[in-house]
């Protein structure tokens, strides 16, 4: 389910444009928190599975690297489970480091987390139709939502914006 944030602020003081700006900042905050491996409750994400698995070469979101080729050659075996698959297959550039559990493998899901709606009354952040599986991921590792720290930052941002208008 998408996350909805509603405001009880006089319409003369708060516009859809204000909500859109705040929604963009909130979205960036969620993505940053997620990249640090922290869930919507401010806790570290549950570790990735170490149960051995096979990943098909065809149809995988990200081409499997590392691991052991299967007897048929159509898949790759990872003794260390999804944790090993992710570690071996993810892009390792010279950029910044992220947490081990950051919910990014190909980048598809997190890049499809968007501001879906912004009105004077609030905004909605959710996943596009291309990454609906992210809602199932959210059941195990709650990333869609606002941590207590996120709520404080959001409240302070609204307060600062309103003080500037009064």
Predicted regions and their residues:
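Short, Lys/Arg-rich flexible segments
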Residues: 1-166
């Amino acid at each position: 389910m998408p996350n909805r944030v509603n405001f009880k602020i006089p319409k003369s003081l708060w516009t859809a444009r204000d909500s859109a700006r705040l929604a963009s900042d909130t979205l960036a905050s969620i993505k940053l928190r997620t990249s640090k491996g922290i869930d919507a409750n401010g806790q570290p994400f549950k570790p990735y599975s170490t149960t051995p698995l096979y990943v098909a070469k065809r149809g995988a979101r990200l081409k499997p690297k590392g691991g052991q080729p299967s007897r048929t050659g159509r898949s790759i075996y990872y003794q260390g489970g999804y944790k090993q698959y992710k570690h071996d297959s993810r892009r390792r550039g010279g950029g910044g480091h992220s947490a081990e559990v950051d919910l990014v493998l190909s980048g598809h899901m997190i890049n499809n987390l968007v501001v879906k709606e912004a009105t004077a009354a609030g905004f909605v952040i959710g996943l596009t139709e291309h990454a609906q599986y992210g809602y199932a991921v959210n059941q195990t590792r709650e990333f869609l939502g606002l941590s207590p720290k996120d709520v404080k930052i959001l409240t302070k941002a609204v307060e600062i914006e309103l003080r500037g208008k009064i």
